[in-house]
Amino acid sequence: MEYQIKAKRSVYVGKVFKVEQVDVTLPDGKPAIYDLVVHPGSVTIIPVDDQGLMYFVRQYRIGAGRMLLEMPAGTMEENEDPLECAKREVREETGMSGELIEVGDLFLAPGYTSEHMNLYLATGLYPAKLDGDEDEFLKVVTIPVKEVYKMIEMRQVNDGKTLAALMLALPFLKKYMD
């Protein structure tokens, strides 16, 4: 027997996501109720210029209660193509654009959210500023690629999506590590 979803109830609808309670029959036949954060999906972008500088953003994150160093990222609009979202987000958050290639995808925390994230490497960067969200206060920070991986070893980068993105992009970034 497999997990069987029996019913879903919306218990909260917010600006970005909603919360559902999901009635499930477990593989052993017993019932269970799960809380699920239903999310439209998101993207993370790893922007790297021709000199091997990575573009990060530093911003306050309410869940962490402090400023974090992160790759540019954003939430997709309903039915938005992930690549189009990535193109928009990198411009809004860093003021740069370039050629984007997908380096992977992942589920952020599948134990409680449906959020699926697509990860893109942006190269051949050029200025292309777009106005960002009114509630975002970001500082763009550039760091050489090889320094970024030293920072990871020293536990100075602790945003999960950023760490995953940097791991998936590593094969594309080795040329900047010499």
Residue ranges, per PLM feature:
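Conserved Nudix-box catalytic region and its N-terminal flanking loop in Nudix hydrolases
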Residues: 2, 34, 43-88
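Acidic, metal-coordinating catalytic segment for phosphate/diphosphate chemistry
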Residues: 2, 8-44, 50
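The catalytic Nudix box helix
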Residues: 56, 71-102, 120, 134-135, ...
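Short loop segments at secondary-structure junctions
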Residues: 27-28, 49-51, 60, 123-127, ...
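A generic structural signal for well-ordered coil/turn residues at beta-strand boundaries
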Residues: 13, 18, 41, 113-116, ...
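Short, solvent-exposed loop/turn elements at beta->coil junctions and helix N-caps
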Residues: 8-11, 104-109
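Nudix hydrolase/Nudix homology domain
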Residues: 30, 67, 78, 111-112, ...
